[in-house]
Amino acid sequence: MVILAVNNSPMRFGDRSGGVSRRRVILTFPEVIPAKERDPQLLEKIAGELAVIVRHLMQRFTRLDDARALLQAQQSSEEALEIKRSADPLVDFCGDLTPLSTPTGLFIGNANIRPMNPRRYLYHAYLSFMEARGHQHPMSLTAFGQAVPQTLKEYEIELLKRKTKNGIQTSLELSENCEADWLPRCDG
């Protein structure tokens, strides 16, 4: 099954299981065609040529692995990742995380820990990120905890965790650009 969605801005998907992101291929067409140059019959022309287009694709990709390799390369391209970052705040937030080889990084934390400490707790960092970027509806801790491991796969990062007496510790730390970009400052 092929679903083609054409839009001027990146589409947002509520699915956090990874089902859509594993299958979605983003192709950008950034060039805007001036209104006076647009073909009002374009859709009908494409529909009329669909059989030829499909036949051409079938001839071009006689080996399914060739087509799959090209689609997967586009799926994980920098261009596609930038579009996903602009469409999904969690993908954008995860782009500001750096993986560690062991779970010695940020603790997950929760919303009740006061004062907020985004340099120590992953969930606090996420809340600070959302506030700094003007996003009005952050995820609950439970939804965040379920979505982060799947979202990190966009960056080919596996989340490692361990239980400690201070809470659950992750294999993530904040990247250096967070300090200047969105972390709260302590300019006394």
Regions found by a protein language model. Give the residues of each.
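Feature primarily recognizes SF3-like P-loop helicase cores of small DNA viruses
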Residues: 1-188
